[in-house]
Amino acid sequence: MNLDDEFDDDLDAERVPNLGIVAESISQLGIDVLLSGETGTGKDTTARRIHNMSGRQGRFVPMNCAAIPESLAESELFGVVSGAYTGADRSRMGYIEAAQGGTLYLDEIDSMPLALQAKLLRVLETRALERLGSTSTIHLDICVIASAQASLDDAVEEGKFRRDLYFRLNVLTLKLPPLRDQPERILPLFTRFVAASAKELNVAIPDVCPLLQQVLTGHRWPGNIRELKAAAKRHVLGFPLLGADSQTEEHMACGLKFQLRAIEKALIQQALKRHRNCIDAASLELDIPRRTLYRRIKELSI
């Protein structure tokens, strides 16, 4: 496997020289890694790929630190024993313990409460934990990958993130650049996402006209790769590239006729697939005469 090719979708080889070698070294050494970058730049995918290359037999366990209420965060992360507090009627492991032998991925760690950061630091340093309400120590064999959208340097200076935890996590930081800083990747990625979406939806691959290319390269892509994937799927379906509310030159050039033609073609292709190219069954589902269906198949080059 060519590791540089495998990681090209998510990381910038110019910012991280010999990226494949770096990624492989990370996975084999099992060191803690910090991924930084805006939303949609591929942090989740990168974390999972590092785990997959590591050869670790345990699970890849993702935890979104921003999605768990602060009142539940400690028990969710460290686990709990029965009777530790009112409502804890059974013992259960937390995210950290569930990653035993594998990789714990702490997504949006910049959202973790300060009190929990101190306890996480102790786990990272000792590679051991006690479940909430227990004095029994559980020794850990885990790799930890954390990601942050905001700058942790700024969060430390603002008192929102512990300096010692930052230094502990910052053994190696991989910065994933936003798509707007890599304009040369927009068209190749979009073309590939369009092909993948067309295959998924079982429809023909639509053209990417020069005007559409201008729209793609002129957009800022605040949602980065995630937004680009969504735009590719909308294009395959014949919908406005940048969402229903956007008024771009692409919409005016393609017009309603183009959009309706693309939607009609997709509907006919999907009906034919469901009925194994049986014209009678497809025309019945689409509620159009057989003669009309034959004509539209020819006109739409299906």
UniProtKB/Swiss-Prot annotation:
Q: Which UniProt keywords apply?
A: Activator, ATP-binding, DNA-binding, Hypersensitive response elicitation, Nucleotide-binding, Transcription, Transcription regulation, Two-component regulatory system
Sigma-54 factor interaction domain location: 9-237
Sites where the protein binds ATP: 37-44, 99-108
Q: Is DNA-binding there in the keyword field? A: yes
Q: Does the keyword Flavoprotein apply?
A: no
Family matches, as InterPro entries: AAA+_ATPase, Homeodomain-like_sf, HTH_Fis, P-loop_NTPase, Sigma_54_int, Sigma_54_int_dom_ATP-bd_2, Sigma_54_int_dom_CS
Against PROSITE patterns, the record matches this protein to: SIGMA54_INTERACT_2, SIGMA54_INTERACT_3, SIGMA54_INTERACT_4
Which Pfam family, any one of them, does this sequence belong to? Sigma54_activat
Q: Which CDD domains match?
A: AAA
> One GO molecular-function annotation for this sequence?
ATP binding
Which BP terms does GO give this entry? phosphorelay signal transduction system; regulation of DNA-templated transcription; symbiont-mediated perturbation of host programmed cell death
- Where's DNA bound on this chain? 279-298
Q: Which PANTHER family match?
A: C4-DICARBOXYLATE TRANSPORT TRANSCRIPTIONAL REGULATORY PROTEIN DCTD (PTHR32071:SF57), TRANSCRIPTIONAL REGULATORY PROTEIN (PTHR32071)
Provide the function of this protein: Regulates the activation of the sigma factor HrpL which itself induces the expression of hprD as well as other hrp loci which are involved in plant pathogenicity, hrmA and avr genes. Probably interacts with sigma-54.
Stated name of the protein: Pathogenicity locus probable regulatory protein HrpS
* Organism phylogeny: Bacteria, Pseudomonadati, Pseudomonadota, Gammaproteobacteria, Pseudomonadales
Q: Gene encoding this chain? A: hrpS
